[in-house]
Amino acid sequence: MNSDASATTNSWAINFDHVSVTYPNGTKALDDVSLTINPGEMVAIVGLSGSGKSTLIRTINGLVRATEGTVTVGPHQINTLKGKALRDARGQIGMIFQGFNLSERSSVFQNVLVGRFAHTAWWRNLLGFPTEHDKQIAFHALESVGILDKVWTRAGALSGGQKQRVAIARALSQDPSVMLADEPVASLDPPTAHSVMRDLENINNVEGLTVLVNLHLIDLARQYTTRLVGLRAGKLVYDGPISEATDKDFEAIYGRPIQAKDLLGDRA
């Protein structure tokens, strides 16, 4: 992480204090997790499917509410917020989903402008009259992920990798203090997966943002992040520098030997 960028960016810390999440069906997705993410860190969250990775990410922006403990993001105790207070906090938390969540019939530009809704008068959003300031932010976000040339293209006409870059630009246009990415490279080919991860790395290095990314690919975690958080059956089982994480550490997180599907490699 670039310390100079961090000094000029309103990047937030994230703190989990004995957080548990139990779903209505009785499934305990998180079990007494205590964890602090420092401002400007680039963190990989790894674990098998069902380990609690997505739940952890979603408690940060209030999409999932902690049933025990507290989740604090910057100045906000997220699990206590409701209504406008929660919407305002979410306006500072960028979120990138595996499924892109784009409006396929709208242009790339219109999709990216959605990230400005929390900062813009409601009537402008309703009528589609963005301010000149919002337009410039959208253009800059698209340029930063290398897809400005597609600004007027319909989102549905893009490739999977291009759609994910638009999703990143949309999150960037929020001017966030935290960036969350939930399996952002799932189903992408190796070159595109590396491209998306470089975009996230650039956001961390240049913008100084706190970035948390859920990954199931060990080699990508090692190449692009600096800290590893491991979850197994909802419990925090590993937390340390990614440079110190051995194959045995990953096997302990997964509860099994490393398999080919855990590595991106050069597979098609």
From Swiss-Prot:
It is found in: Cell membrane. PROSITE patterns: ABC_TRANSPORTER_1, ABC_TRANSPORTER_2, PHNC. Residues 14-258 form the ABC transporter domain. It catalyses: phosphonate(out) + ATP + H2O = phosphonate(in) + ADP + phosphate + H(+). It is a peripheral membrane protein. Its main location: membrane. Transmembrane segments: none annotated. It is an enzyme of class 7 (translocase). Its EC number is 7.3.2.2. ATP binds at G47, L48, S49, G50, S51, G52, K53, S54. Keywords: ATP-binding, Cell membrane, Membrane, Nucleotide-binding, Phosphonate transport, Translocase, Transport. GO terms for molecular function: ABC-type phosphonate transporter activity; ATP binding; ATP hydrolysis activity. Pfam families: ABC_tran. Belongs to the ABC transporter superfamily. Phosphonates importer (TC 3.A.1.9.1) family. The complex is composed of two ATP-binding proteins (PhnC), two transmembrane proteins (PhnE) and a solute-binding protein (PhnD). Part of the ABC transporter complex PhnCDE involved in phosphonates import. Responsible for energy coupling to the transport system. This is Phosphonates import ATP-binding protein PhnC. The lineage of its organism: Bacteria, Bacillati, Actinomycetota, Actinomycetes, Mycobacteriales.
